[in-house]
Swiss-Prot record:
GO biological process: phosphatidylinositol dephosphorylation
Annotated gene: mtmr10
Alphabetized UniProt keyword annotations: Coiled coil
Key word Lipid metabolism present: no
TM stretches of this protein: none
Gene Ontology CC, one term: cytoplasm
GO molecular function: phosphatidylinositol-3-phosphate phosphatase activity
Family affiliation: Belongs to the protein-tyrosine phosphatase family. Non-receptor class myotubularin subfamily.
InterPro entries: MTMR10_PH-GRAM, MTMR12-like_C, Myotubularin, Myotubularin-like_Pase_dom, PH-like_dom_sf, Prot-tyrosine_phosphatase-like
Species this protein is from: Danio rerio (Zebrafish)
Protein name from the UniProt record: Myotubularin-related protein 10
Coiled coil: 652-683
Length: 752
């Protein structure tokens, strides 16, 4: 993203042919159009009389206005606006037609008169006057602007500015530095961990020893301690200043062994199982002569930390998982097939194209390996070391998945944010270089199979992914804590910013969601299905916790093999096909006879898990057969009109469950008021409700589903994928937007 070398084209354009009878600009009222700027944001270049393509080929829905490039975003200020929808969630940092520069993947300029096109990179020249600008975005949107009435020189300058500022060569050129320098300097003491005091649970940032101490106590890791030898980043440049190590390892030993590890990344404690088994991650040992000695010392220390003194299992991730280059190549192919060409043509080859991308295969591989690690911790009661050359990519994925499967705390909103902060941000994942996607897709698979076990929704995961392209948060802006500290100090020094008691600029974390959304909009993150420890119900006057019982029918989807009475795919002459439930029993009894290889202990562990009722506050294992995995449609296909279901999809169940949950909360409040509970008489239920969709004051009147609901809710594929905000769309807009995909043309195959 910030490398000096320009990346090769990664997108194909699937847009209608250029129009020869373009409409002229209508007679618009003269009014001053100004972009709304954030603190530290400045206008770099702009062009007037620009047409933004919205949907239909006729262009009747297109918008006219000013195209502005700032040091933060591409902003389009329109003379007129699309009809206001009944549903409107407002992003506090971005307007309706704003695109963060960090979200721009490619900038394509076109001159339809000369038949020229060019993919612009940073500091490149443009030898023709563009008549059209196409922006390919990392969130799968495609944005088109026409310069038919704009000045040729201003059109060229704004295109060059967008290409230049969307690919900065220095991280300090990111808008976040100017934003923090202007807005957050001098706010020390007013915020704690990026959250206003009194604002509820705070997400630990793990940048101090107290956060790690609390995590040790929470997991019961009594034989582990907080290590401070990396304060000032003197030992390892990519490790945090505070991390957890075995009690039996002295600081002097760690300093001595650090030089033997790749990038001096000594072993890091991740999590402790209730049995005492520990999950540890570490980089490879770079010194072959010291490898045996150091491995024995580390393994011995981890063994001593286990109450049963169990052995240590080493899991080599580099040998068992695809590398980061393969994952990025799969993501690139997935992007190309998600930007649908002709819907009729792509529908026929969708499954084969998806399979050839290998994306779902890689997702399944990561899930399977995480299950194997869970087996070692849960069934074998041994500690596990995750080995990776640099310990900054694959380890982040596996350690997070293991904790999501084993620890119900990580499936709460607060716990999940702490997990990402601990295993990705503080562990030194290269967000600046990678802008990784796999972590979200794997976790979405778990959410999809056990939605009632997670406090957050699919919308939350999608918005969290989109936040990577808003470069004002420390969470996804740097490769490691040291890089953040160094760049912050250098920027403050160059701008003569007095830091006071702070050692560096204090960037807000993404976990302070009030930076982006109102409290009402944040209720879209709350899952009405969540069965947590605090989710209780009243039954016969007593409080009972919600429980979940697994249907025995689900077992049939996990069984492998065929019944022994079937020969060459057919039944014997005297056999009949029994009911599904009895077929399951026959499959179970004959499973051992048809297996070519004996069942491994880990496979038996998985089979036993699915034969029992699932405890949503306990261990969760994912279904791993291909039929159980699915593409994350809300994230990858939300901007494709043909892929949407107006007034349908999972959101219809979400709406009804939200209303039902809100009604239960309302009745509970009324019951407490009836019993005379203190401080509840004047409490407004609507103000404190956790649900976005609320029940009516009279339970007899069930609210009808809103007309703006669709399977892409709360995102909107209006027109030419042009609306980035969380906006609703009526059916008419879907139909208008669908017309843009009927014709195709390739713009990115050639460069000039």
């Amino acid at each position: 993203m910030f490398s000096g070398k320009q990346t090769k084209p990664t997108f194909k354009s699937y847009l209608p042919p250029l129009q020869t009878d373009l409409k002229k600009s209508p007679q618009l009222p003269i009014k001053k159009l100004e972009a709304k700027l954030l603190p530290g944001e400045i206008v770099v270049n702009e062009a007037n009389f620009v047409r933004k393509c919205i949907g239909a080929d006729s262009g009747q829905d297109d918008l006219w206005g000013k195209l502005v490039c700032t040091n933060f975003k591409v902003s389009f200020i329109s003379h007129n606006s699309l009809p206001q929808q009944r549903f409107q969630c407002t992003h506090r940092l971005l307007g309706e037609h704003d695109i963060p520069l960090a979200c721009v993947e490619q900038v394509v300029t076109v001159n339809d008169v000369k038949g020229k096109q060019k993919i612009l990179g940073s500091n490149q020249k443009l030898k023709f006057n563009p008549t059209e600008l196409i922006l390919y975005c990392k969130d799968f949107r495609i944005i088109r602007f026409r310069f038919d009435e704009a000045g040729p020189e201003s059109a060229k300058k704004v295109c060059l500015a967008i290409a230049h500022y969307s690919h900065p060569a220095d991280p300090q050129l990111l808008f976040g530095f100017e934003y923090v320098g202007k807005r957050y300097h001098g706010s020390a003491g007013e915020r704690v961990n990026g959250v206003d005091p009194g604002g509820g649970l705070q997400t630990p940032l793990f940048d101090c020893s107290s956060d790690w101490d609390r995590e040790i106590k929470r997991t019961g890791a009594s034989e582990w301690r907080v290590c401070t030898i990396n304060q000032g980043y003197f030992i390892s440049p990519s490790l945090p200043e505070f991390f957890v190590v075995p009690v039996s390892l002295a600081d002097q030993d760690l300093k001595q062994y650090a030089c033997c590890f790749y990038s001096q990344r000594i072993p890091l404690w991740c999590w402790n199982h209730p049995s005492g088994s520990a999950l540890v991650r570490m980089s490879n040992i770079s010194d072959p002569q010291q490898q045996r000695k150091v491995e024995q010392r580390i393994s011995s220390a981890i063994t001593k930390s286990h109450p049963l003194r169990s052995d240590v299992f080493k899991s080599d991730l580099d040998k068992n998982l695809p590398n980061i280059q393969d994952i990025q190549a799969a993501l690139l192919k997935l992007r190309q097939i998600c930007v649908i060409e002709s819907f009729e043509e792509s529908e026929e080859k969708w499954l084969s194209s998806l399979e050839s991308s290998r994306w779902m295969e890689y997702v399944r591989t990561f899930l399977r390996h995480a299950v194997e690690v869970v087996y070692m911790l849960e069934s074998r009661h041994v500690s596990v070391i995750l080995l990776e050359k640099e310990d900054r990519d694959l380890s982040c994925v596996i350690s997070s998945l293991v904790q999501l499967m084993c620890d119900p705390h990580c499936r709460s909103l607060h716990g999940f944010q702490a997990l990402i902060q601990k295993e990705w941000v503080m562990a030194g994942h290269r967000f600046l270089d990678r802008c990784n996607h796999l972590k979200k897709s794997d976790k979405e698979e778990l959410w999809n199979q056990y939605p009632a076990a997670f406090e957050f929704t699919e919308v939350y995961l999608t918005v969290l992914g989109d936040s990577m392209w808003v470069p004002v948060f420390s969470t996804f802006l740097f490769n490691c804590p040291r890089q953040r500290a160094e760049h912050s100090r250098d920027f403050a020094s160059s701008k003569s910013i007095h830091l006071g008691q702070d050692q560096a600029l204090r960037f807000p974390p993404v976990w302070d969601w009030s930076q982006q959304f109102s409290l009402k909009d944040q209720t879209l993150f709350n899952n009405p299905l969540y069965v947590g420890k605090i989710a209780t119900c009243l039954q016969n006057g007593t409080v009972k916790t919600f429980t979940h019982r697994r249907s025995k029918k689900n077992y049939s989807s996990t069984v492998r093999g065929l019944p022994s009475l079937m020969r060459n795919g057919s039944l014997g002459p005297n056999d009949t096909l029994t009911r599904r439930n009895s077929l399951v029993l026959r499959l179970r009894s004959d499973l051992s006879q048809v297996r070519e290889q004996p069942e491994t202990p880990s496979e038996r562990f998985v089979r036993d898990f699915f034969s029992r009722a699932v405890d949503l506050q306990g261990l969760l294992l994912p279904q791993l057969l291909p039929s159980h995995l699915s593409v994350w449609k809300l994230y990858f296909l939300r901007w494709v009109p043909e892929a949407q279901i107006p007034h349908g999809g999972p959101v219809t169940a979400f709406h009804k469950l939200s209303v039902l949950t809100d009604e239960i909360e309302m009745l509970q409040n009324q019951l407490r008021q009836y019993k005379g509970a203190a401080g509840t008489a004047n409490t407004s239920h609507a103000e404190h409700s956790k649900m976005y969709f609320k029940a009516t004051s009279t339970p007899q009147q069930c609210p009808a589903p809103p007309g703006y609901l669709s399977s892409s809710f709360p995102f909107s594929p209006v027109g030419n994928l042009c609306r980035p905000g969380i906006l609703g769309t009526p059916l008419s807009k879907f139909l208008n937007g669908a017309k843009i995909w009927l014709s195709t043309e390739t713009l990115a195959n050639e460069t000039i």
